């Protein structure tokens, strides 16, 4: 009843024929989902071409910078699945010591070249749902190994907020707000890029890092006043993107050391998930993005959207135009919009050139559509799975984001017993814990304006049932229940 978007397919007109959270990645490890396989093996030693699982030979997929959401989802693709997969993992954990020390010397071209030598002729596809490094690395590697994927130049354009807006504004001016860029550090005497107030964020960033509404010069100066160690970390975070830009887009002067300012938007926020296969677009669904009152911090993602029937056609049409203009030809995507009911305007905020792992389960639970199965089929150029792989269990789903704004951490980390209770009581729920202390906590408050300590994904028969479930979990975990969380 809620699969309004799924199955809407559009042939995108290519504008050019030129080819353009937290993770738990394990270097070189491999496993057959839900089936014991040797870990840490080179793919050539596994002889997977001859390893049968039932009547199917497992397809070999390399996962780059795997995320916590990925690990749980991969267990569905075991020996008894319609199409089993053998997964390999490369990358590192960006937010965990000592794995993140690799950031100090990480070079995107050396990394891709190493993977090319190791996996050439030994995998059937490469996938990453990681926005920071993974999706770009996967694209670069796929091109070198002639595997399906989003073109690398397209990834760069999507992730470079200024380039994306420039390209889209030229063809669809009504889709983007007023925008301008400026370098940082910002010289105090430099003119501001736009009249205040405006919204500012890095040209290349994830998790809404340093994204803030600015209404005076002092607030902007404070936002961009970094300690030496912060400056060092920022340079290391954006260096891989700049390395790719220097080689693939040397014509672009504004690298990731720039900020972008946009005119303020008002209204409700939405995101749409879907995929493109050889230029053919299909949308999974439209999701509401609800913020903590008075902030720009995500509080809840809710599916199906309350605006679905009203905005379905417009979102579909604008998404189609945006993807065509970006020459987005093959792969999953997630696009975010602002809708202002007072002016009836629909504005683009982000184009994410990868699958949204946080919302992917919505479509499986509510519509019976497995976004991961489609993602893997795209990566290996296999026939797409049936639209309904399973019988939907629920009518609604949501992702609840638990935050603190008082400078403190959350003292109620879930215990093993509490996690076991959740798995037994609500087996379809997914809980991710991100509690921080010390320097990591202080950095998160400065860069994000809040501390996101947990995410809880749940589904319900209807809105009332979902509310009952999340309230039950909060009471059991000892977490404060913000009424806005379940309104």
Across the structure, where does each feature detected by a protein language model lie?
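Active-site "cap" helix and flanking loop/linker of ATP-utilizing ligase/carboxylase catalytic domains
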Residues: 314-335, 353-411
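Phosphate-binding site of ATP-dependent enzymes
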Residues: 224-291, 314, 338-347
